[in-house]
């Protein structure tokens, strides 16, 4: 028995494949979280425009080929990174009376972020399911991703009391020429255009 056969007897190849797939998935979850956190740097006062395509293309590529549950987790991780850092300022209100409410600051931000992250997770699931079941051209895939993302942002801004903070379009606030389309399509329409253009590099990389 050669060494390879002996190794296969001790460690089954299917087990190794399972471990490799799990590691690959965890890498996508981590990438989703990091990409979401990077979006915070696209908003004022940082306004690093280059990070817009980096963040959204990373999510776009990371969702391809994932099952329903895994796509949800990757999208949720993106939202957790985005809101966990993007709305951390909410904690300041608990420190006004720190002795009474200070201990609630981190749990409150974490809980709200986890809840808001469901919206990008829904967009991620819808996109991943359609992309997995049908052969989408790059342009159509980008349009679908941007559409689902915009719908998720609209829902987040209107469901219950609404929370329309840190929309994708806010990344253009400091760029007068780029934010002009908002006059015709509004902030959500501008979010659609922003995300659509942002995922084009990701689609090109997968071509």
Where do the protein language model's features map onto the residues?
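Membrane-embedded alpha-helical bundles of multi-pass enzymes
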Residues: 7-207
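N-terminal acidic, proline/glycine-rich, low-complexity intrinsically disordered segments
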Residues: 1-5
């Amino acid at each position: 028995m050669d060494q390879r056969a002996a190794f296969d007897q001790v460690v089954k190849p299917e087990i190794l494949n399972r471990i490799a797939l799990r590691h690959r998935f965890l890498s996508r979850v981590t990438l989703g979280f990091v990409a979401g956190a990077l979006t915070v740097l696209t908003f004022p006062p940082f306004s690093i425009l280059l990070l817009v395509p980096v963040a959204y293309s990373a999510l776009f590529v990371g969702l391809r080929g994932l099952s329903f549950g895994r796509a949800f987790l990757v999208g949720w991780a993106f939202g957790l990174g985005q809101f966990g850092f993007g709305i951390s300022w909410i904690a300041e209100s608990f420190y006004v009376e720190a002795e009474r409410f200070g201990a609630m600051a981190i749990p409150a931000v974490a809980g709200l972020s986890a809840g808001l992250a469901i919206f990008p997770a829904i967009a991620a699931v819808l996109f991943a399911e359609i992309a997995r079941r049908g052969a989408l051209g790059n342009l159509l895939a980008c349009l679908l991703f941007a559409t689902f993302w915009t719908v998720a942002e609209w829902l987040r801004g209107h469901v219950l009391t609404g929370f329309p903070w840190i929309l994708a379009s806010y990344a253009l606030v400091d760029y007068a020429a780029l934010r002009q389309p908002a006059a015709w399509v509004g902030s959500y329409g501008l979010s659609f255009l922003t995300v659509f253009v942002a995922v084009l590099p990701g689609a090109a990389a997968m071509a």
